[in-house]
Amino acid sequence: MTTETRSLYSQLPAIDRLLRDSSFLSLRDTYGHTRVVELLRQMLDEAREVIRDSQTLPAWCENWAQEVDARLTKEAQSALRPVINLTGTVLHTNLGRALQAEAAVEAVTKAMRSPVTLEYDLDDAGRGHRDRALAQLLCRITGAEDACIVNNNAAAVLLMLAATASGKEVVVSRGELVEIGGAFRIPDVMRQAGCTLHEVGTTNRTHANDYRQAVNENTALLMKVHTSNYSIQGFTKAIDEAELVALGKELDIPVVTDLGSGSLVDLSQYGLPKEPMPQELIAAGVSLVSFSGDKLLGGPQAGIIVGKKEMIARLQSHPLKRALRADKMTLAALEATLRLYLHPEALSKKLPTLRLLTRSAEVIQIQAQRLQAPLAAHYGAEFAVQVMPCLSQIGSGSLPVDRLPSAALTFTPHDGRGSHLESLAARWRELPVPVIGRIYDGRLWLDLRCLEDEQRFLEMLLK
């Protein structure tokens, strides 16, 4: 060991001496004595490695307390951090899908802070049923006889099949054997539920007679799966629920539908593409309809099943129901969200999902033009900052081929180097509230459809 190396090692402080420093008192109060000591030991090991490898001290050795504070502050950040979603995908699965309405946030907060009547009947002081209040709301909105709530729509499909068709066959069109994110496939779910898949028709064309010929003494259900995350176009044929229900009645076989996204309002009245609604399928005579709570409905993650009373009763009594049931926070948020649907005239103002989906391209364009000047002044030395038209998508497998006209701020490096775009995107991901855009066609795009807090956005990007 050289004299210089020995001298550098001698400059490393003892942990006890560091802890006696007044600057460490608040750190110990905030993060705990044990964690501070653990980190100091780790940092001393790091410093020794740097000395050994490069014959220098790390820069942070000049202020140990500051470095400890920086590291522990970063460590203490929640893994679920708020971000500004400027990806152009409104219901972004990786960013948590639907934003909750203020009424839902308030309801969840109350449910978290206090005991609630989750399974308690105030009328007779007996045990109640956790789905009761929501079932009443859902029946009022959809016209169903009863309803059941589980923790997501994949769970809803699993429960629906396991409780009504285990050990038997379920007839489904080949063109509806969907796969959604996370390799969730209808054939796999059927297998897990103990059902036998009987696929009929072809990928692009399925006729009523295909279902009829598939039915046998072991058939439990005729099933429709709404292909919400893809579209088959061209030379196609599919029968709708009303026609399938008529066939089911003739053959005395129930019809069930996995609707996927599930919208409780006619989106076309807001200028959006129409999606099938649960109430339409219930009116057509479908026995069970499942759909998601956190997609087009705009609520928390939940799986909702509405339908005939005797069918729902089979789901409620199945052992899987307890394993898949929703907790009090989910139920509180979902109830508050559903109550908004009782006043549809105010829905686009109070439901964030609908509010964002219905923002006009003109309004977003004006917003982009308002923000372009200060951002161009700040970033103009490296990037050309422009306002450009773009197309937003709904996301989460909803209306996959439909796009919403929008406007974006784009950042194009003057030198054309893609590494500069990656670097800029990385810098924005390190902001106190990360800004998430997308890199495409040699530009970094910030689709402003979901930007509502302009002031906070500007303050962070102009630092």
Curated annotation (Swiss-Prot):
Subcellular location(s) of the protein: Cytoplasm
Family matches, as Gene3D superfamilies: 3.90.1150.180, Type I PLP-dependent aspartate aminotransferase-like (Major domain)
Entry keyword Nucleotide-binding: no
Catalytic activity of the protein: L-seryl-tRNA(Sec) + selenophosphate + H(+) = L-selenocysteinyl-tRNA(Sec) + phosphate
GO BP of this protein: conversion of seryl-tRNAsec to selenocys-tRNAsec; selenocysteine incorporation
Pathway: Aminoacyl-tRNA biosynthesis; selenocysteinyl-tRNA(Sec) biosynthesis; selenocysteinyl-tRNA(Sec) from L-seryl-tRNA(Sec) (bacterial route): step 1/1
Residues with N6-(pyridoxal phosphate)lysine modification: K295
Alphabetically ordered keywords of this record: Cytoplasm, Protein biosynthesis, Pyridoxal phosphate, Selenium, Transferase
Transferase as UniProt keyword: yes
Top-level taxon: Bacteria
Essential cofactor(s): pyridoxal 5'-phosphate
GO molecular function: L-seryl-tRNA(Sec) selenium transferase activity
GO cellular component: cytoplasm
Enzyme Commission no: 2.9.1.1
Chief subcellular location: cytoplasm
Cited NCBIfam families: selA
General function of this protein: Converts seryl-tRNA(Sec) to selenocysteinyl-tRNA(Sec) required for selenoprotein biosynthesis.
Record's subunit section: Homodecamer; pentamer of dimers. Binds only one seryl-tRNA(Sec) per dimer.
Family of the protein in this entry: Belongs to the SelA family.
UniProt name for this protein: L-seryl-tRNA(Sec) selenium transferase
Source organism per UniProt: Escherichia coli O7:K1 (strain IAI39 / ExPEC)
